[in-house]
């Protein structure tokens, strides 16, 4: 999922895949280790600077992206919801899964950039679907590992969005 950003950035911005990968690697390492997009923000600025993204763009785009743009959340949280529903013997239709993904995508704008912040938005989704809220406790138990990869994808998407907006501007 995250790897789709590399060719996208390369084809739209003329930044080589290697340069993009080298620039975002420190940001990914910090995101992976801290599980916080916010903690990775200084390194994200450094990556944007390495990619020659103008400071007037990165200075606006990156803080907004860290706060609002959760690239990996809808897919991962929908998968977690499907897992919990299956665990409790509840069948979800494809339509319900799409509704879940849309709801999580919209609610992810409100999730904080802190470790496991995306789980905070799950309760309203579970309640509205009649899923057992206790299932979120199971997700919390395994979220340590999952959140590392989600944060890595999110911080990569933050740099990518900054590069794409710089190209448009």
Language-model features, listed with the residues they occupy:
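Helix-loop-helix junctions within the multi-pass membrane cores of secondary transporters/permeases
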Residues: 26-108, 158, 162
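Select transmembrane alpha-helical segments in multipass membrane proteins
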Residues: 24-25, 140
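Entry/N-cap segments of selected transmembrane alpha helices
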Residues: 1-6
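Transmembrane helical segments that form the transport core of multi-pass membrane transport proteins
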Residues: 8, 13-17
């Amino acid at each position: 999922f995250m790897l789709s950003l590399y060719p996208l950035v390369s084809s739209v911005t003329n930044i080589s895949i290697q340069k993009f990968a080298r620039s975002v690697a420190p940001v990914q390492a910090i995101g992976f280790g801290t599980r916080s997009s916010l903690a990775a923000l200084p390194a994200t600025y450094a990556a944007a600077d390495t990619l020659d993204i103008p400071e007037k763009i990165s200075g606006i785009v990156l803080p907004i992206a860290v706060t609002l743009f959760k690239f990996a959340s809808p897919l991962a949280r929908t998968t977690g919801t499907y897992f919990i529903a299956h665990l409790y013997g509840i069948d979800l239709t494809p339509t319900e899964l799409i509704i879940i993904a849309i709801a999580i995508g919209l609610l992810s704008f409100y999730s904080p950039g802190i470790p496991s912040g995306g789980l905070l938005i799950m309760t309203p989704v579970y309640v509205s679907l009649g899923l057992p809220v206790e299932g979120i406790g199971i997700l919390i138990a395994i979220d340590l590992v999952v959140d590392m990869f989600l944060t890595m994808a999110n911080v990569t998407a933050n740099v990518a969005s900054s590069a794409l907006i710089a190209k448009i501007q």
